[in-house]
Amino acid sequence: MAKKSWIARDKKKAETVKRYAELRAQLKAEKDYIGLTMLPRNASPTRTVNRCLVSGRRRAFIRRFKLSRISFRELANAGMIPGVTKSSW
């Protein structure tokens, strides 16, 4: 599992992105790039990281389920994810 401090840091970044989203859109529409550079770095949506809801892992993230591959496999094998079955042909 990821460290709680990393998970908290990413949540804080996501909150910063939400706070400045409207202002960023306005500055982009006005093409005020100097104004954009004056905003905090964490206000950019590209700095947010997708994390697994179960383990907090950031690598091998499956967007559709918001889980890492490891958590997805464990939950799918246990039958905890509706509609997911093991493939066989």
From Swiss-Prot:
It comes from Akkermansia muciniphila (strain ATCC BAA-835 / DSM 22959 / JCM 33894 / BCRC 81048 / CCUG 64013 / CIP 107961 / Muc). Belongs to the universal ribosomal protein uS14 family. The keyword Ribonucleoprotein applies. This is Small ribosomal subunit protein uS14. GO terms for cellular component: cytoplasm; small ribosomal subunit. InterPro entries: Ribosomal_uS14, Ribosomal_uS14_bac/plastid, Ribosomal_uS14_CS, Ribosomal_uS14_sf. Binds 16S rRNA, required for the assembly of 30S particles and may also be responsible for determining the conformation of the 16S rRNA at the A site. One of its GO terms (molecular function) is structural constituent of ribosome. Part of the 30S ribosomal subunit. Contacts proteins S3 and S10. Keywords: Ribonucleoprotein, Ribosomal protein, RNA-binding, rRNA-binding. One of its GO terms (biological process) is translation. It comes from the Bacteria. PANTHER family: 30S RIBOSOMAL PROTEIN S14, SMALL RIBOSOMAL SUBUNIT PROTEIN US14M. SUPFAM superfamilies: Glucocorticoid receptor-like (DNA-binding domain).
